[in-house]
Amino acid sequence: MAVYSTNEFKNGLKVMVDDAPCSILDCEFVKPGKGQAFTRIKIRNLKTGRVVERTFKSGDTLPSADVADVEMQYLYNDGEHWHFMVPDTFEQYAVTENILADAAQWLKEQDVCVVTLWNNEPIQVTPPNFVILAITETDPGLKGDTSGGGGKPATLETGAVVRVPLFVQTGELIKVDTRKGEYVSRAKE
């Protein structure tokens, strides 16, 4: 297993902290006028999602986290588990709701997501950056509504609610940015 020194820390690096896989979100090298230099990092625990700040003396090391990001296809939800499959090997994984978190509202069957595996167990699911979903319910638009005139809430086929321009109607397909949960544009069928 690889070991990273403090001078090798960078954003996005996956390391083990307190026996849990973590991802470095922010890394800052600090050299005070008096005393030893140190590195301050902000890390996200990949299992719990909690973000904490830690300080390491210059020369400290952390082991690498044995995590793998695998592209998987979302198959179905059986009520308590969401099922994903690796397209190449047809290997299937079941993911619970607490691991899926907010990603569940953007998943449509057959979508390809990135699933983070640790010890061959899924610990995080990242939906595609943009998804195309149908609007199942929204207020009717009136003649003369334009894109600059504000917005209205719309319920999508997955149950997610996003703000859309006034001219968008029920039944239309729209493109949504899953990172922000915002309407991007209309989509062609």
From Swiss-Prot:
The modification N6-(3,6-diaminohexanoyl)-5-hydroxylysine is found at K34. GO terms for biological process: peptide biosynthetic process. Keywords: Cytoplasm, Elongation factor, Hydroxylation, Protein biosynthesis. It comes from the Bacteria. The keyword S-adenosyl-L-methionine does not apply. One of its GO terms (cellular component) is cytoplasm. Gene3D superfamilies: 2.30.30.30, Nucleic acid-binding proteins. InterPro entries: Elong-fact-P_C, NA-bd_OB-fold, Rib_uL2_dom2, Transl_elong_fac_P/YeiP, Transl_elong_KOW-like, Transl_elong_P/YeiP_cen, Transl_elong_P/YeiP_CS, Transl_elongation_fac_P. GO terms for molecular function: translation elongation factor activity. Pathway: Protein biosynthesis; polypeptide chain elongation. It is found in: Cytoplasm. Its main location: cytoplasm. May be beta-lysylated on the epsilon-amino group of Lys-34 by the combined action of EpmA and EpmB, and then hydroxylated on the C5 position of the same residue by EpmC (if this protein is present). Lysylation is critical for the stimulatory effect of EF-P on peptide-bond formation. The lysylation moiety may extend toward the peptidyltransferase center and stabilize the terminal 3-CCA end of the tRNA. Hydroxylation of the C5 position on Lys-34 may allow additional potential stabilizing hydrogen-bond interactions with the P-tRNA. Belongs to the elongation factor P family. Involved in peptide bond synthesis. Alleviates ribosome stalling that occurs when 3 or more consecutive Pro residues or the sequence PPG is present in a protein, possibly by augmenting the peptidyl transferase activity of the ribosome. Modification of Lys-34 is required for alleviation. This is Elongation factor P. It comes from Legionella pneumophila (strain Lens). The lineage of its organism: Bacteria, Pseudomonadati, Pseudomonadota, Gammaproteobacteria, Legionellales.
